[in-house]
Design a protein with these regions (language model features):
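Short, small-residue-biased leader/transition segments that mark boundaries at the very start
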Residues: 2-6
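Conserved nucleotide-sugar phosphate-binding/catalytic loop shared by glycosyltransferases and other
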Residues: 13-63
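A nucleotide-sugar donor-handling region in carbohydrate enzymes
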Residues: 20-27, 127-179
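An aromatic- and histidine-rich active-site surface loop
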Residues: 77-95
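A short, histidine- and acid-enriched strand-loop-helix "catalytic/donor-clamping" loop
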Residues: 100-115, 129
Length: 179
């Protein structure tokens, strides 16, 4: 899903995208990035066995802060509801960079479920200047939180977009049952 957003920006001359990887699910991410032709410019290499959420978030903020200082982005697109997405939004906000939240407005109404994703969604939403909501329902959730209508755009679902893109490829499988 992130790959579609990055690839579309890469194909638009108005944007100079700077993909950053946290290192989470490295092998799976490499396969997907290869499929969509994406090479992260930075890899934070955050993931290590036995670390807790606070360590992940603090290391993410520190690593992203260095990248923000080096790259001087105009905008940070924080996608999803992971703790590293929240860390990216906070690091950018602390540096005065505009934050765009992709997949904004998803809500369960229970700050502890799912944990920590629901809290991450709300925290990102507090610092985002533009909220890209996947559905009209997500937009309504944001409106109930007093986000201005002019700051919300319903964009559709990035997972479905990526699935439709991949389904359109002329892929040959070795196993005839998959054709």
């Amino acid at each position: 899903q992130r790959q579609m957003c990055i690839r579309d920006r890469d194909n638009d001359e108005r944007f100079d995208s700077i993909p950053v990887s946290t290192g989470q699910h490295k092998e799976m991410l490499e396969q997907v990035n290869t499929m969509f032709g994406i090479t992260p410019k930075h890899d934070l290499g955050l993931m290590k066995p036995g670390q807790g959420l606070n360590e992940i978030v603090s290391r993410a903020i520190a690593g992203l802060d260095s990248i923000i200082e080096e790259e001087q982005p105009d905008v940070i697109i924080s996608q999803g509801d992971t703790s590293t997405a929240m860390a990216a939004a906070l690091a950018g906000f602390h540096r005065g960079v505009k934050i765009v939240h992709l997949e904004a407005g998803l809500r369960t109404g229970d700050i502890h479920s799912p944990f920590p994703e629901e809290a991450n969604r709300k925290l990102i939403g507090q610092v985002a200047e533009l909220h890209l909501a996947p559905t009209a329902g997500s937009m309504e959730n944001l409106r109930r939180e007093n986000v201005r209508s002019k700051d919300i755009v319903v964009t559709g679902n990035t997972v479905i977009d990526a699935l439709l893109e991949a389904a359109s490829w002329d892929t040959k499988f070795e196993d005839p049952a998959l054709q």
